[in-house]
From Swiss-Prot:
Residues 378-385 are annotated as: G1. InterPro entries: DNA-bd_dom_put_sf (IPR009061), EF-G-like_DII (IPR053905), EFTu-like_2 (IPR004161), IF2_assoc_dom_bac (IPR013575), IF2_II (IPR044145), IF2_N (IPR006847), P-loop_NTPase (IPR027417), Small_GTP-bd (IPR005225). It comes from Methylococcus capsulatus (strain ATCC 33009 / NCIMB 11132 / Bath). GO terms for molecular function: GTP binding; GTPase activity; guanosine tetraphosphate binding; translation initiation factor activity. Residues 103-274 are annotated as: Disordered. The lineage of its organism: Bacteria, Pseudomonadati, Pseudomonadota, Gammaproteobacteria, Methylococcales. The keyword Chaperone does not apply. This is Translation initiation factor IF-2. Residues 403-407 are annotated as: G2.
Length: 868
């Protein structure tokens, strides 16, 4: 320790300078100036002085030299209480303090203790004993006062009871005398004089016993106490009859102890049987929260009435409804007000707005640069996946069925220029919704156009999606290695869509590339990063994560799996996710290569396990801290979806009713679709439903993500539906049921194969269409009679030819008078099958004999035509 001045020591210790100087003087140090230097020896002397003054003497041995014990003894004092009750026990506590000193230190300690200390301890012990005695006396006096008060109360009750009995006996005597006067014919028995009941002598109070407290005697049972009381009454001179008279009061009548009928002149005193609770007269008015759609039963439950009452109110308003029918918000509010309650229009997103407000507050965290999210769009087979394949140096396209992309693939690529997140969307017409989702979550759209093919329908659609989302475009002219590649043609066609290249004065970068040779790939990546720098992409990192679901599926052994893209914040393992109507805790996270992760930041595409179900593709997800609120929101969203479906079903039923009026009956083709991912299911459902015609309606009655289960097979069996498995297979129990019941099951891995098969099924369900085709006309020249055929017409074939066993029509003056079958066809005397134009023949018409000269016989046949 170095030497310091007094002023410095005061600053180190944290005490005033004057106080430190005073303490130095008390320690015997001749220091008066604040700038004097203190040595280590002087500081130790000051420290020893302070310890002695505060009673802290430095000891070399940590072993205690004395032990102080506080002894507490409890004694019990038994105190008698009122008669009939057990004795009361009082606890008396005596506290003693003893100090034990080591024998080796005893002489020194005894010398150290002064006489004043010993006197103080003796005084404390005496005071404790006096306090204990005073407490015991106080408790005893209080107990005696309670006993005296209890005895006085019992005496007063006994006196009041005796006076009441005397008054009751006097009243009975007066009634008996009145009865004797009214009944003069019968000798009235003389009433016995009342027997006075001596008052019981009060018992002397029990003296408190100073012995050990005994266990309290068990209290008498109520029935035993009642029996003892009756015994006391009988011992006092009351008979059972007197007791009965006492109990019955005015209703007791003489004459064998039987009751007589009450006289009409004297009113009977009946006990009041009115209930104590009275129903409130004012009506109860509830505040009813009315959502956008609610069923009649739920509305009745919120108003605490029966559903029938709500239906009656609706009928008065002119609305016919059932208990399960869905009402809109306006109708429900009118019903609530009609029934006298207060309606409150409930907003659907109250809880969600609260959570979003919290997210908005958290979004004020500092923002850091993030990788760009790039979506690759273009027409089918223009080389989108192959281009991404070359960038990632892997065979992505080989894993897709038919070499086409059927759901969004998300990959993060680390290049020499930085990280880029790529989204590969399908280019088929059936995947329009998936391309629209890809445009919403992206920062830059790379439009891939084949230089040898030019602009195609899905190319125009991709331009519209990017323009609607306000996302900048980078055009990649692919397949430049082909001989017939024409980049100028691509530029001209895109200029027609208002996509102008930079070299022509526009703002869109056009990059010629080849996914096969890799030419222009680095230039394309540079163009993407330049565009990202212009956009200045940033996102907060140190907040809970939020983003969007790209795809979801149901995997065996892993459960619901969601492919998500984080847009802001950091997602950690164990976070609680709210994703559409699904919730769950993140059990595991994986990147696009299957590597497990503990956390992921913005623009990272990851795979998440742990949700309660497979969410819809395009749903937004957020990390919430309040698990209860998240469950409420998920339940509310599910209820809203169910209400929407019910309302749509109700509307569909009404539409079906009106469409059936005046129209032919339609045929339903029911389908049950199971797919590997949510996006493919959505695309299949949309594409197959659009195949409906006026005569055949395609209905998807069930669908989901995952393998075909026994439940799906039972649904298809019950609804006579076709089972379609898209990149999934049926499990063992489902296969057994499908084979036993002969359910129509089809597996597909390319969406267009499924569409073609359903088209064939629709054509097979249509009724065959037939067209009448006139093949010949014969002119009747003469009529003959035949014993075998009846009337036979001699005819000349003027048009076409006539064949045997075909339907015919007989025309007279170009009016059909008969339609039947050609029975016999002869030429001269020979039966022939066919007679050509310009030749004569004999025709016999089955079941018709009114053929005349000049008639025409028209021969026709029905030809089946393909339905359209």
């Amino acid at each position: 320790m170095s030497d310091v001045t007094v002023r410095q020591l005061a600053g180190i210790v944290g005490i005033p300078l004057d106080r430190l100087l005073h303490q130095l003087g008390d320690a015997g140090l001749q220091i008066s100036d604040a700038d004097d230097v203190l040595s280590d020896a002087e500081k130790m002397k000051l420290l020893n002085h302070l310890r002695q003054s505060h009673g802290k003497v430095q000891e070399s041995v940590t072993e205690p030299k004395r032990v102080t014990l506080q002894r507490r003894s409890v004694t019990e004092l038994k105190q008698g209480t009122v008669p009939g009750k057990g004795a009361k026990t009082i606890s008396v506590e005596v506290r003693k303090k003893r100090t034990y000193v080591k024998r080796s230190e005893l002489p020194e300690t005894s010398d150290r203790l002064s006489e004043a200390e010993q006197a103080r301890r003796a005084l404390e012990e005496q005071q404790q004993r006096e306090l204990a005695e005073q407490e015991a006396r106080r408790q005893q006096e209080e107990m005696l006062r309670e006993q005296a008060a209890e005895e006085e109360r019992r005496r007063q009750e006994e006196a009041a009871r005796t006076a009441e009995e005397r008054r009751r006996r006097d009243e009975e005597e007066r009634q008996a005398a009145a009865e004797r006067e009214t009944v003069a014919a019968k000798p009235a028995p003389v009433a016995a004089p009342p027997i006075p009941r001596p008052a019981p002598e009060p018992r002397p109070p029990a003296r408190p016993s100073a012995g050990k407290p005994k266990a309290e005697a068990p209290r008498a049972h109520p029935a035993e106490r009642e029996t003892e009381a009756r015994g006391d009454k009988r011992s006092a001179g009351l008979s059972r009859k007197d007791e009965y008279r006492e109990l019955q009061g005015d209703d007791f009548r003489k004459g064998g102890g039987k009751r007589k009928k009450p006289k009409t002149g004297r009113p009977m005193l009946m006990p009041e049987q009115k209930h104590g609770f009275e129903k409130p007269t004012a009506p109860i008015v509830y505040e009813v929260a009315v959502p956008e759609s609610i069923t009649v039963s739920d509305l009745a439950q919120r108003m605490s009435v029966k559903g029938v009452e709500v239906i009656k109110a609706l009928m008065k308003m002119g609305v016919m409804a059932t208990i399960n029918q869905v009402l809109d918000q306006e109708t429900a509010i009118l019903v609530v007000e009609e029934m006298g309650h207060k309606a409150i229009a409930q907003k659907e997103d109250d809880l969600e707005a609260e959570i979003m407000a919290n997210l908005a507050a958290e979004a004020e965290a500092p923002q850091l640069p993030r990788p760009p999210v790039v979506t690759i769009m273009g027409h089918v087979d223009h080389g989108k996946t192959s281009l991404l394949d070359y960038i990632r140096k892997s065979r992505v396209a080989a894993g897709e069925a038919g070499g086409i992309t059927q759901h969004i693939g998300a990959y993060q690529v680390k290049t020499d220029h930085g990280s880029i997140t790529f989204l590969d969307t399908p280019g088929h017409a059936a995947f329009t919704a998936m391309r629209a989702r890809g445009a919403k979550v992206t920062d830059i759209v790379v439009l891939v156009v084949a230089a040898d093919d030019g602009v195609m329908p899905q190319t125009r659609e991709a331009v519209e999606h990017s323009r609607a989302a306000g996302v900048p475009l980078v055009v990649a002219m692919n397949k430049m290695d082909k001989a017939d590649a024409d980049p100028d043609r691509v530029k001209q066609e895109l200029v027609g869509l208002n996509v102008v290249p930079e070299e022509w004065g526009g703002d869109v970068q056009f990059v010629p590339v080849s996914a096969k040779t890799g030419a222009g790939i680095d230039t394309l990546l540079d163009a993407i990063l330049v565009q990202a720098e212009v956009l200045e992409l940033k996102a907060p990192v140190a907040i809970p994560a939020a983003g969007v679901v790209l795809e979801s599926k149901l995997e065996k052994g892993r459960g619901p799996v969601a492919d998500i893209l984080i847009q802001r914040g950091t997602l950690k393992k164990g976070d609680f996710l709210l994703c559409g109507k699904e919730i769950g805790r993140v059990r595991a996270m994986f990147n696009e290569n299957g590597k497990p992760l503990k956390e992921a930041g913005p623009s990272a595409p990851i795979e998440v396990l742990g949700l309660s179900g497979a969410p819809e593709a395009g749903d937004e997800f957020i990390v919430v801290a309040d698990e209860r609120k998240a469950r409420e929101i998920a339940l509310h969203r599910e209820e809203k979806l169910r209400s929407t479906k019910l309302a749509a079903q109700q509307a569909a039923k009404l539409e079906d009713v009106f469409s059936l009026m005046g129209s032919e009956e339609t045929i339903d083709l029911n389908l049950v679709i199971k797919a590997d991912v949510q996006g493919s299911l959505e695309a299949l459902r949309s594409a197959l439903t659009e195949l409906s015609t006026d005569k055949v309606k395609v209905r998807v009655i069930g669908g989901g993500v995952g393998g075909i289960s026994e439940t799906d097979a039972n649904l298809a069996l019950a609804s006579n539906a076709i089972l379609i498995g898209f990149n999934v297979r049926a499990d063992g129990s489902a296969r057994k049921l499908i084979e036993e019941r002969g359910i129509d099951l089809h597996y597909y891995s390319v969406i267009y194969n499924a569409i073609d098969e359903v088209k064939k099924s629709i054509n097979g369900m249509l009724e065959p269409e037939f067209k009448e085709q006139i093949i010949g006309i014969a002119q009747v020249r003469e009529v003959f009679r035949s014993s075998k055929f009846g009337t036979v017409a001699g005819c000349l074939v003027v048009e076409g030819h006539v064949r045997r066993n075909l339907p015919i029509r007989v025309l007279r003056d170009n009016v059909v008078i008969f339609e039947g079958q050609l029975e016999s066809l002869r030429r001269f005397k020979d039966d022939v099958n066919e007679v050509k134009s310009g030749m004569e023949c004999g025709i016999a018409v089955r079941n018709y004999n009114d053929v005349r000269e000049g008639d025409q016989i028209e021969v026709f046949e029905k030809v089946q035509v393909a339905p359209h």
